Amino acid sequence: MTLQDTVRYFIEETKILPCLSVTCGGAGLCVQARGGVINEQGTPVSDRTLFDLASLTKLFTGLLTMRLWEEGRLDLTRPVTDYAPQYRYLSNMPVEKVLGFEIGLITPERIDTQKTPEAAKQQLWAVQPGEIRGRAYSDIHAMVIRDVIEGAAQSEYGAELTRCILRPLEMAETFLHVPEERRVDCISCRGEHRIEQGKHILRTDAQPGIPHDPKAARLYPEIMGHAGLFSTQGDMVKFAQGVLREQVISKMTIRKMARNRTGFRRADGTYQQYLGTLCYVKHPVQYFSEIPAYESDEAIGLAGFTGQHMSIDIGTGVFTLFLGNRVMNRLTVLVPEAGKSLTDYGLQADGRGSIVWDDGTRVVSSVNYVHQKDAHFHQAVADTLGLPAWRRAGTAWS
């Protein structure tokens, strides 16, 4: 299987994504493929295409935090309020607990439903710690850490990002704010369809160059560290290779990032997510793992809602990059009503297929597309680079 087979599967065979750019390699190797269109006008994906990185932004935030720690400017054991006093309910909470998703963080009201950016900030600053209920992963943790970064550095998030990552790696096509003349190169996120408990939701307000994430959009033009960056395939390759070459932080510090802080097997046999420093880490069950089978437990990775995935492994020296668009004119979320499954709505059990919308149009599904990546992306990477499974099936997990 080749990377072009990956593109063909997602773009042509299943139509899960309207466009896709995939890459794999190492510090000195890069193999790429791409295909599809980025907008309703049919503009082909190219090396100028700007992808909404969504939660891949957290990788930048996590690396930036650890860079400040390496420089001695941030003490992870100190409370959040030492660096960001506006978080009055986190006065006894060490930064490292927030950084590793080791506590639950709850705002009084939803940030994305606030009428103004200032009201949204007030909700964020009123966040309170609590027990983790359900998923440990959340956007709020990275948003808090963004403010911690600014307090520790006595500098704006964007300035520190430029100093520590964007400028050293020559990432000239990675933007916190997309220039007006480059918005034509942005993927379109218009026409997102959702079905939640029988309610049909159509989002038509997404604008090119504005983050798709509702919280990031509400707080824009301020970038809050959890989402909001835009970048090209080429720049993201520079990012991955720069991390592998230790141009951002040391291998020792990356290993610290990759340490599991949350994951465990519950008494009922289910698992809590395996998370590290604002990232996913290796999971013992591959179906639930954002880290591919051929990468080690020194890998860090993330997925972005808009159709993105990245993993970087200093153990094997391999990186993977999946930049797509699962939003434009797609069904992205389907939460079935009680007693129903995806098949009751006309989809296949794995989320593939299409549905007929209220107006009679047929909408292709990208629901649960992430579980297609192992067979149709990571297998292609393994074949391309000649990579065996890092840990044999059935081998005990330490």
Residue ranges and their predicted role:
Residues 2-51, 333-341:
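Short, conserved catalytic-motif segment at the N-terminal edge
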Residues 8-12, 50, 131, 218, ...:
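Short, P/G- and charge-enriched loop/turn segments at secondary-structure junctions
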Residues 14-21, 40-97, 127-140, 224-227:
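Short active-site loop at a secondary-structure junction
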Residues 21, 97, 310-311, 319-322:
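Structural recognition of the beta-strand scaffold that forms the well-ordered cores
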Residues 91-295:
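Short, surface-exposed loop or secondary-structure junction motifs
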Residues 245, 258-263, 284, 330-398:
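Short, gly/Ser/Thr-rich active-site loops of penicillin-recognizing serine hydrolases
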Residues 288-299, 336-341:
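Short, surface-exposed loop/helix-turn segments at secondary-structure junctions
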Residues 299, 306-319:
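Short, surface-exposed beta-strand/loop micro-motifs that present aromatic residues
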